[in-house]
């Protein structure tokens, strides 16, 4: 058998095969380049006696992309001209004839994603959509399973949350606090940044008469933006929330923000002040009309903003991976007359279907990435993140809704939520406001603040590292 030696040759001396029928997209060249950057040039280019490439055209292009001047080559000089022509075809086609054990492949991808490594699983060449489909195949479930949206009766939900509490729910976090306070959001993210946003802020529309009708399901008004704000005030409210979403998410991330048709103007104004681009506006079409006198509203709007200028993720790629997506989303609403709908509506007045959020998450994020929601509501974004292998970071102002999110998570995941920090966010904010007021009035040191210390632990409550976390927050506050 002929012994071959690797030669290191300048790229300029390598000649492409005249009739190379194999094509390489720019995307694939970038993937090969990333593999070479990470693992090295492990597969030498095969050339003939005249430096014509028999195998490795994509690797040579990737090497040029990386700015390399040379590449390792193996010279094959025993073939006839006809053999070479056949080999060039065979080298490309035979690899395509192989298959996959999809269960083993999914397990390997899943374990790679869970390992502590400094590279993304897409370095394997599998797309975000392919990884999602394979791993979801390990534990198949029906899309749009009604059980995903089933919410427990409000009367069955225990009262646990207080303002400022930070909870861990498996890989997810929930904080009870003001989404407009950047310190609350900083506590929630803990130096990480979100890969995408799906959030449903209050619509500045009174719940009574617009969401709650005259039936047995009645709702109190939201804690803020429930119809009491002027146009300017609501625009400022949205702009403050958007500023936090932008600050705590990755450059290039897509932010899905739900809104009623009445406040399109405020959304566009606040969005233009914070986002680089409005990528699209999505219409969620429900299967039944809701409240309304001059036409019953059967849709809601979802604005798809882009944060920053970096390229955004797009996993569906015009249906390339079997997911045909448009800007009209058709999912059933909670006012549909089916079993379980009243329970959902009783938990929260504007529940979004989990299946809809699942699809949005899969469109623009990777498994393991963070999904940020600063208006947690009933917790649908958290359930959707869990189903798709993402990590939710959820903020909700109202302790009652926080209690319902906890209860919903524990029922769905059959896991217990853990309180990991108690009341620090809101108490720190109050303390800082008090300090600022004293400094502004010139009476610092003369007036005693009235900010209360953290309340005594509730029965059965564990407050880990309370002193150290308080010091950490004081230090961060400056």
Positions of PLM-derived features:
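Core catalytic lobe of class I
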Residues: 2-402, 459-464, 472, 477-478
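S-adenosyl-L-methionine
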Residues: 163-186, 406-451
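Polybasic, lysine-enriched low-complexity intrinsically disordered terminal tails
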Residues: 1-3, 434-478
């Amino acid at each position: 058998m002929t012994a071959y030696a690797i030669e290191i040759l300048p790229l300029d001396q390598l000649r492409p095969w005249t009739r190379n029928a194999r094509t390489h997209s720019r995307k694939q060249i970038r993937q090969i380049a990333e593999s070479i950057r990470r693992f090295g040039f492990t597969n030498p280019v095969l050339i003939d006696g005249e430096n014509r490439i028999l195998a490795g055209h994509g690797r040579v292009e990737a090497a040029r992309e990386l700015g390399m001047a040379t590449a390792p080559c193996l010279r094959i000089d025993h073939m006839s001209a006809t053999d070479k022509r056949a080999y060039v075809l065979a080298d490309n086609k035979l690899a395509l004839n192989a298959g996959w054990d999809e269960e083993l492949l999914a397990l390997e991808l899943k374990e790679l994603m869970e390992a502590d490594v400094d590279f993304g699983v897409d370095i394997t060449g599998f797309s975000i959509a392919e990884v999602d489909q394979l791993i979801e195949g390990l534990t198949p479930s029906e899309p749009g399973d009604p059980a995903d949206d089933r919410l427990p009766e409000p009367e069955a939900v225990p009262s646990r949350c207080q303002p400022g509490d930070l909870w861990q729910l498996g890989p997810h976090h929930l904080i009870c606090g003001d989404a407009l306070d950047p310190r609350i959001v900083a506590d929630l993210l803990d130096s990480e940044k979100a890969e995408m946003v799906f959030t449903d802020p209050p619509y500045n529309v009174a719940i009574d008469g617009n969401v709650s009708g005259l039936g047995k399901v009645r709702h109190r008004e939201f804690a803020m933006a429930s119809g009491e704000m002027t146009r300017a005030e609501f625009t400022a409210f949205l702009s403050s929330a958007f500023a936090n979403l932008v600050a705590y998410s990755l450059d290039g991330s897509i932010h899905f923000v739900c809104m009623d048709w009445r406040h399109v103007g405020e959304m566009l104004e606040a969005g233009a002040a914070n986002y680089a681009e409005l990528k699209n506006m999505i219409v969620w079409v429900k299967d039944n009309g809701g409240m309304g006198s001059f036409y019953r509203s059967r849709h809601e709007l979802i604005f798809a903003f882009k944060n920053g200028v970096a390229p955004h993720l797009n996993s569906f790629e015009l249906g390339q991976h079997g997911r045909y997506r448009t800007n009209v989303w058709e999912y059933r609403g909670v006012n549909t007359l089916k079993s379980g709908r009243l329970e959902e509506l009783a938990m929260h007045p504007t529940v979004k279907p989990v299946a809809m959020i699942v699809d949005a998450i899969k469109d623009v994020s990777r498994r393991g990435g963070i999904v940020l929601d600063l208006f947690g509501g009933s917790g649908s974004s958290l359930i959707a993140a869990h189903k798709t292998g993402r990590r939710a970071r959820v903020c909700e102002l109202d302790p009652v809704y926080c209690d319902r999110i906890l209860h919903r998570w524990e029922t769905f995941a059959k896991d217990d939520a853990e309180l990991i920090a108690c009341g620090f966010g809101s108490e720190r904010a109050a303390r800082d406001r008090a300090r600022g007021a004293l400094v502004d009035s010139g009476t610092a040191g003369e007036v005693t603040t009235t900010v209360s210390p953290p309340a005594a632990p509730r029965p059965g409550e564990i407050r880990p590292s309370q002193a150290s976390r308080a010091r950490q927050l004081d230090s961060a506050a400056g």
